[in-house]
Curated annotation (Swiss-Prot):
EC number from the UniProt entry: 4.2.1.108
Family: Belongs to the ectoine synthase family.
Native source organism of the sequence: Teredinibacter turnerae (strain ATCC 39867 / T7901)
Function: Catalyzes the circularization of gamma-N-acetyl-alpha,gamma-diaminobutyric acid (ADABA) to ectoine (1,4,5,6-tetrahydro-2-methyl-4-pyrimidine carboxylic acid), which is an excellent osmoprotectant.
Protein name: L-ectoine synthase
Amino acid sequence: MIVRNLTEARDSNRRIVSPDGNWESTRMLLKDDKMGFSFHITTIYKGADFRMHYQNHLESVYCVRGRGEVETLADGKKYPIEPGTLYILDKHDEHMLRAFEEMEMACVFNPPLNGTEVHNAEGAYELNAEAL
């Protein structure tokens, strides 16, 4: 059994802050845990407006707190995000994420992240990032 505490994880190297200042993510479960997926609690800062395109991963995102929107770039559709909303990037969807308020999100990635990933120039995470 694995048991971790979010407050303790935030005070460790499991807390990753994006270089562009849009988000921070506490990586609670990672590839080395051998569960087949990773689980993160991610804070998207108010005013963040950025493009992502996870070419190497599938992701599901559940909004715990805050409000914003996600836009699929293929068709320009915008979907409101509020507490209780789940969006699923099941087709490696290129998208924009906008935070009208600070948002706290619970994120699941498959394949699992190693831990140190930040978005590359295409808005994706690399598969060969350093493990925590």
